Amino acid sequence: MQLCAFVFLEDISGELPPYEETYLSVPMDPPMREAYRELEDEIRKALKAHRGNRSVLSIMLNTLLVYPDHPYGLGTLYGKEFDPELKRTVRFVIAEPRDLAEDGVYSKERKLVEEIKKELAEGRRCQIFAVYTTKHDVTARLRRILDNEGIRTAVLRASVDTSKREAWYARQVKDGIQVVICHPKLVETGLDLLDFPTILFYESGYSLHTLRQASRRSWRIGQRRPVRVKFLCYEGTMQTSCLRLMGKKLLVALTMEGKFAGEGLQSIDEDDDMLSAMARELVERNGIGETADAVWKALNLEHQKLFPTTSVRTDDAPFSEESIFHAQDDPAGLVGGAFDTAPILVFGRRPELPSGRRRRAKATVPEQASWFGLQ
């Protein structure tokens, strides 16, 4: 390989379609709000009674994030602590969440259906991300709700081998699937979801790396449609706190990477431990700093500055059965103009040789080129 170009998205953003992130906060239905506040109060009392106990912190984080999306079947919640008298670890009750109707469709789910129908009406397939996929399987619940609405839906499971996931997506598109649901970690690297220009984070999780990778799966070389990323959460819940703190950490991370100069370096120590930050908010009954909406608006604004999309095609016509997946633009065309006639190696392809020109049996250049002429 004589020439290889490593480019960042900002280097080719002029050739990419617009990218937009939207934060959607949904108020809870009255029965759920009452049950959630009840659970929140019980966990708050446990946090105060067992200060610094990591088992209570872990229960707090996971339970308050998943309960609004799966408000049944959680059972009694237990913490653990060492009893000096018994000289062993003992369990204690933290809370007993109230079970709501399993067959009900709640406000955030209704909002999700509304957003998906809106996107499908524009001919845009949707990718949904949810992080609770095992014991309290939110993905299966969402699929059932979408199936009942007549929306053709598939769920990507971890059982599909990494090397076969691209082919799995191609099959779903060919079979007429309109929505795919999966954990964001399953697609965070190595997949270009060009057929799914709309991404909905039904649950974000609290891994900044996973969120950053998964949110860009559609915004890649070869994408021809504007990309929309939407984050859904229940208003005034741990989901809101999590998204807001994730947004602040992302602002700090981008600032440290030199992507842009923004506020936030002073808040690294304050919000670096998300678990402690969310526990503090719960105990003190108030948010810390800006609202989640304000943080994500700031992120979106900085993104527009960082990735100006001035020379892009924004055709947003409905998709046909002949998918973009099978007819992508040649990625080399987007960067080819920046170089001379030297061939560019595109991943997965060999550079074409002019007709009549023989391939050399052995390269005459050293294995690794030297920038300074040193051997």
Region roles according to the model:
Residues M1, L64, M246:
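A residue-level signal for conserved active-site and pocket-lining positions in enzyme catalytic cores
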Residues M1-F8, Q223-P226:
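Conserved P-loop NTPase motor "coupling/switch" region that bridges the ATPase
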Residues E34-R37:
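Long amphipathic alpha-helical segments
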Residues R152-L245, K249:
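Conserved RecA-like P-loop NTPase helicase motor core
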Residues I43-R51:
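Short, polar/flexible loop-turn hinges at active-site or ligand-entry regions and domain interfaces
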